[in-house]
Amino acid sequence: LLKAPIRRCWKDTRSVKKIPGLAGRVRVGAPDASLTPASGVVAVAELVGRLGVSAALDDAVGVIKQRDRGLSAGQFLVALAQAQMFGAEFWSGLDRRRADTAGEALSVVATPASTTAAGLAERFGPMELAGIEEGVGEIAGRVIGLLPAARRAALRAGGATIDLDGTDVECYGSKKEGIAYSYKGARAGRPHVATWAEAGVVTAADLLAGDEDPRPGAGSLIERSVATLRAAGVTVRAKVRGDVGYFASHIAQAAVAAGCDFSLGVARNPAVWRAATSIPEKAWRKAKRMKGAQVAVCDYAPAGWPPGTVTVVRRVKIRAQDISADPRARRRRTIPNGQLALALDGLLEHVYAYSFIATNLDVSTGAKAVAVEAWHRMRTDIEDRIRDAKHGAALRHLPSATRAANTVWMWGALLAVNLSAWLQELAGLDTADGRGRNHLGTLRHRLLVVPARLVRHAGQVTLRLPPGRQLLAQVLARLRRLPIWT
């Protein structure tokens, strides 16, 4: 009789049967087209369909193709924004979305091929880009009309803030159009963005080169943002808010000409330092929500600025031992030179760091000045929107060789941020004040990129999600109670 082969397990070898779990017995079967990694696309489809987003953008942007076939301008913009919401980082990400058969069946718009999308983006000129902003205003108005009365009144009549800021997007390739070396030494494009702070919505944007100064275009951003707010039904006088990078008389004048008030950071110059030292000690008031900070008003008014401009001053007490020894430290620039020298020599126990705001808002009392300073400090809201566009969507890349295509890519990211804000506002994921919304990356994890099986049976379509607490059913229930825009 032949003996069976002897099964040996050497010293460093383990039997497959001894591997924990099922790892040793798993085989890969045939692909299942009923599975999707992104079941949340149905929530975006409900939002886009009920608000009429594609149609609103079509009406505002107009026709971008001679033949009426394939995607319209609005459908293309929705598809691009949706792809970035679901993780597309470059044009090739659209091809991965197209490969998701079940997800495409749930989508309200078809995802174009990457080459088609890049070609469509080239068709957008200045008029079409202006139409995107017009469409945003129309859609924002529809969203506000569906909100509870208190939130609707707060957005339309309670206060409207236009924030201004820019960001650099590092790029590679010496032949890219509209890309230049920034002051940081990197080749970059520079999205210049205006947002409606209370609604968390981008209202206007330009794509500049890395070496372009954003200040000359700030007046246009303000004017276009005001038009967007008016289209959304805002009746209150808007306020323009910006950091020290927008310290320019023509920006303040543009804000006033557009029917806005302004609050802009002031560059630290000898005149404003002298004005700060003349503030009586008894004039200082404790700042809101900032430990060790005090607020006062000085009589400094920059030359050429609108009548009624005053300067609000904030100072923060700093221990001498906490001052950085690095002469490049930013905090050192906020301390008067005389105080800084004495503190570094050990002759003072503490100093004050100063910040300045030029505004035409009412700061006639100490309480009003404190309120204005606390509100101005919230200008960092726009940094959160830009961060979401870069790390939640894909504004961290400008993937094309032409400025036109990169500008449309930028708007895809900004529309993704807007769709995220509108979705959370209407689905009850926000806290009814604009402060409780998730970043797009978190929303992607919690709602959008959740795997599911698409089941069709007896004329019904069912999504089977993994076990556990899922948001999709709750979100769909809320969205489906909304009327369909016609």
What is the predicted role of each segment?
Residues 231-238, 257-258:
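Short, surface-exposed connector motifs at secondary-structure boundaries
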Residues 165, 236-247:
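Acidic/histidine-rich, metal-coordinating catalytic segments
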